[in-house]
Amino acid sequence: MNGNPTVETKAVFPEGADRSIGGGRLWALVAAFIAICAVFFPAIRAWVGLALADDLHSHVILIPVVSGYLLVTGRMELAWASKPAPWPGGALVLLGLAAIAWVLMARPALSVVDLVALRMGALLVALWGIGFLFLGVEWMRSALFPMAFLLFMIPLPDAAVWHLEEFLMVASAILSESVFNWGGIPVYRTGQVLEIPGIVLVVAQECSGIRATWVLFITSVVAAHLFLPTATRGLILVGAVVPLGILRNSVRIYVIGWLCVEYGPEMIHHWVHRKGGPLFFVASLIPLFLLAWALKWKRKKGEAENPNAMERSGKRDMPDQT
């Protein structure tokens, strides 16, 4: 003993991580990833092109960035000592390659968006396979949310977009009728047509707010994962997105209608109608984050009122020191 105090240092990865992913295994993982990306390069290029050309799918290129951030910030909780799982990994890689071959054969019958969606789905399956093949089942389980979140990088197929738009348009028209009545403006609704004094409003495809609602849904999923302690509260937050999106659409329709009634039908060309979407989207974030804060605050209040339960929970989470 030299009398100097012993200082414990915490490694970047848990003990055993270097042995698990080091050496040839790490390089094999990198090589497999590069090889898969090379095979799917035309699909990736089409995916980026779609994101840059279509506002509805412009968010998809951010999804891998978010997943990567979650993996990096949560790296200490990942099961780096997990053993490779060649059977499920190899099966998923082969499934992804078979899927891309089938998609290429069925290409003439598919729309541009559906083609990109299927190709990116095949790529994602192959990437999951690489994860199992080189990092193992336990690692994939510990990285469940970031890896599953990659599903959002697949563009919504045309059929899904059509059904979601129809639902949002009809629901927004129905709620708008009630909002006009509450606001004191006479209204007569027939389907998606709203007749108010001086003008007839049609809740069209552009009024569905599908892009804002979809982005809000993805935002709520991330917020629930980061800030809410239980799946139940996370589901409450995510489940509030669609009603919130419909309410946002209805309030916007009411504002446009009120402007037309008060100042003349030419107000249909007002910026609120043409370019007001981002403003109402930001406004819809306020109640969403207030709900997230309320759900999180409820947990903190419960822990403050029952410290014994929190102490028991803390003891369960402490590692065995014996």
What spans do the regions from the language model cover?
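Hydrophobic N-terminal alpha-helices or hydrophobic patches in metabolic proteins across all domains
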Residues: 2-322
